[in-house]
């Protein structure tokens, strides 16, 4: 049976991992063993945080809507309930955008929600 030399494959694999670890601190960007673990962990964090990002943005939108609604004399939960009763189907992302950039339109939405309650 012929001897299999794997130098080329190993070098390519190491190069790939070290390229992925570029910019990491200290040995994490230079030593293959440490870099491999760092890249694996980074992948785990990325996977987890892609899901967390969705939650965090929703939290941010709700906080912004709540702040704007309270300035207009209504709590967040009552505001959302009023919008649902008034059949206004605007999602939280757009509501937060309106709350930040168009105060007059948001005040009109609050009045519509108040009248539906």
Swiss-Prot record:
Function recorded in the entry: Binds directly to 23S ribosomal RNA and is necessary for the in vitro assembly process of the 50S ribosomal subunit. It is not involved in the protein synthesizing functions of that subunit.
Spans traversing the lipid bilayer: none
Family named by the database record: Belongs to the bacterial ribosomal protein bL20 family.
Organism: Actinobacillus pleuropneumoniae serotype 5b (strain L20)
SUPFAM superfamilies: Ribosomal protein L20
GO biological process terms on file: ribosomal large subunit assembly; translation
This protein's name: Large ribosomal subunit protein bL20
Alphabetized Pfam families for the sequence: Ribosomal_L20
